Amino acid sequence: MVKAIDIKKEQVAEITDKLQRSASAIVVDYRGLKVEEVTELRKQCREKGLEYKVYKNTLTRLAAENAGMKELVGELVGPNAIVFSYDDPVAAAKVASEFAKTHKNLELKAGLVEGVLYKDAQLEEFASIPSREVLIAKLLGSFKAPISNFAYLIKAIADKKEAEGQA
């Protein structure tokens, strides 16, 4: 027979593992959301490769301490859910923030991104950062522009010399 304490130990180990593996973990207060709204948020998270989980605060506090993320412990008050992102550190904050704009009952409480705790305005600002793919595309675009301009310049010089040679 499995004891309740063993189940709780497994849950703490699971949460600890998720906190350690995640690029970001965003704590949200879902109080006041209807079941359909929570289901929609879960769906949006799944579509982006995120994980939306509700755990008991006591177990989450123990897991945060085990994972060396003590700064998160103070934020675990009231009904909380955690949105985990394992690849893109911005994705969880972005999905939660976008959902909160249309659903006023969802509150972003705190976010742990690569070991740094963000709150309130900092978290909103962090959520506004473009995704990794967009940033890479912008960087590559900025590299491409000077090279393209240089190629056009060389072509113009070659065309001019060719025109002078024919005249």
UniProtKB/Swiss-Prot annotation:
Belongs to the universal ribosomal protein uL10 family. Part of the ribosomal stalk of the 50S ribosomal subunit. The N-terminus interacts with L11 and the large rRNA to form the base of the stalk. The C-terminus forms an elongated spine to which L12 dimers bind in a sequential fashion forming a multimeric L10(L12)X complex. Pfam families: Ribosomal_L10. GO terms for cellular component: ribonucleoprotein complex; ribosome. The keyword Ribosomal protein applies. One of its GO terms (biological process) is translation. HAMAP family: Ribosomal_uL10. Forms part of the ribosomal stalk, playing a central role in the interaction of the ribosome with GTP-bound translation factors. Gene3D superfamilies: 3.30.70.1730, 6.10.250.290. PANTHER family: 39S RIBOSOMAL PROTEIN L10, MITOCHONDRIAL. The lineage of its organism: Bacteria, Bacillati, Bacillota, Clostridia, Peptostreptococcales. It comes from the Bacteria. GO terms for molecular function: large ribosomal subunit rRNA binding. Keywords: Ribonucleoprotein, Ribosomal protein, RNA-binding, rRNA-binding. NCBIfam families: PRK00099.1-1. This is Large ribosomal subunit protein uL10.
